[in-house]
UniProtKB/Swiss-Prot annotation:
The keyword Magnesium applies. The keyword Cell cycle does not apply. Homotetramer. The lineage of its organism: Bacteria, Pseudomonadati, Pseudomonadota, Gammaproteobacteria, Enterobacterales. It comes from Yersinia pseudotuberculosis serotype O:3 (strain YPIII). Its cofactor is Mg(2+). GO terms for molecular function: dGTPase activity; magnesium ion binding. This is Deoxyguanosinetriphosphate triphosphohydrolase. Pfam families: HD, HD_assoc.
Amino acid sequence: MSGIDFKQKISFQRPFSKPSSAEDEYEITRVFESDRGRIVNSAAIRRLQQKTQVFPLERNAAVRSRLTHSLEVQQVGRYIAKEILNRFKQDKKITAYGLDKLLDPFESIVEMACLMHDIGNPPFGHFGESAINDWFTKRMDPNGGSGSEPQSRDQCQVEVLKLREGETELNILRSKIRHDLSQFEGNAQAIRLVHSLLKLNLTYAQVGCILKYTKPAYWSAPIPASHNYLMKKPGFYLAEENYVKELRRELNMEEFDRFPLTYIMEAADDISYCIADLEDAVEKNIFSVEQLYDHMSQEWGAVTPGDLFDKVVGAAFRQLGREQGRRSSEDQFFMYLRVNTVGKLVPHAAQRFIENLPAVFSGSFNQALLEDSSAACKLLQIFKRVAVKHVFNHPEVEQLELQGYRVISGLLDIYSPLLAMPETAFTQLVADDRHRKYPIETRLFHKLSIKHRLAYAESAERIRNLPSEQYEIYEYYYRARLIQDYISGMTDLYAYDEYRRLMAAE
C-alpha cells in the first residue's frame, strides 16, 4: 500500500509553540507524554466524574459517570491500537508505514482521545444538548434566515442577526452564525474546550484524534454522499474554523476527511458503552441478569450452538452460579460478558482498520469500523437495541432527563438578560466589571467563570478592527458562545443546584 506514511499524520507540532525538531524516538515520545500530562491534569477531565453517563444525579458510585466510562474506553482503545500495531509487526509493515519511531505515540494518541472523547458534553448528556439547541433555535430561527436576502417568515429574535435588504455579504454571515449557535454538539465543544477555553496547546495529532465529525456547525448545504457518515453531526464551530484549517494542513487532511486514529477511538467507545449501559441498568435494578439475557436473545433471534451469541452472551450466562461465594452473580456475568465481547470485537475492529487502510489513512472511510454485516457488528447492535428499548425508555431515566432539560433551559432563561444587552453596554460591563444601569446583568456576569470571560474578551479584541456592522454580529456570536460555554461546562449537580438557587427554590 504505497502512500501510507504515518509520519505525515502523527504531527508533534503545537499551535502556540515554536516548531519542534524532535527526531530521536524518546524525544518524540516525550512530546506526547506532555500531552498526556496536560489532559489528565485538566479541569475538564475532573469534571467528568460528576457528569452523567445514563443516570443523571446518581449517588451510587458503582453506576458509571462520564469519567469511569471514559477510563473504560481508554483501555479498549489501547487494546485496539496494540492489536493493530502487532499485526503491522507480524506483516513487517512498521517501517514501511513510517511507524518505527511512533509506536508509543500511536497508542498514546488513541488513549488520550478516548479519555477526552466526552469532555464537551453538557450536563445531563444528550438532553442537555437538546435543551441548548432548542433554546437557541427558537431565538435564532436558523432556517428562516437561510440565504442572503430577508424572508417574510424570518422569526429571528436577535435584531443584529436579522437579514436586511441590500446587505448580501452581511446576511450570509448572519445566516451562518444563526445556524452555528443552533447546533451545539459535544464533539464540537470538545475542540473548543481544549483549544480556545483551556488552551492546553496539545499537538495537532492529539486534537485531530477527537475531531470525530468533520462538518462545521454552520453547515446548511446538502451533505455529499461520499461523506454522509463523517458529516452527520457538527464537528467544530465557526469560532474554531481557522484552527481546524491549520490542523488539517498540519495533518495532511482533506476537507471533511478524518484523522485515521479517530476510527479507533470511535470503535472503543462503541464497544465500551454498549456493555456499560446494560450493567448500570442491572445495578439500578431496572432488570435482572436473567431478564437481560432474555431481552438479548430475543433481539438476536434463533441461537445456535457455537454461533457468536452463544460464544459471547451464552457463555457468560452459563457461568452464573459456577463461582458462588467468590463474587456476586451480576459481577460474574458482566465480567465474562465484557471479556468475551472485547475478545471478539477488538480483533474485528483491528481487522477492519487494516482491510480498509488506504481509506482509513486518508480519512475518507465513510463509516465506523464496527459498522458492517458481520456477526460481531450484529452483536453490538443488539446490545444497543436492548439499551434503547429497556434502559433509555425506563420511567426513572426519562424523569431525570426531563428534569435535566428543564434545568438547562431554565439556566439559559436566567442568563438571557446578558444576551439582550446592547453591544456597547455589554462591552462596558466587561471592561468595568459593572454597569450602573444593569444591576441584574452585572450580578449575572460576575457568576460567569473567569476562564470563559477571558475567552470572550480575547475573541472580542481579535475582531476589534472589523467594520462596525461585522463587529456587532461577531460580538453577539462570541457573547452567545460565552453563555453556552459556561452552562455546558457545568457538572450535573452544579447545574441542578445553581438552577435551584437562582429560582429561589431553597
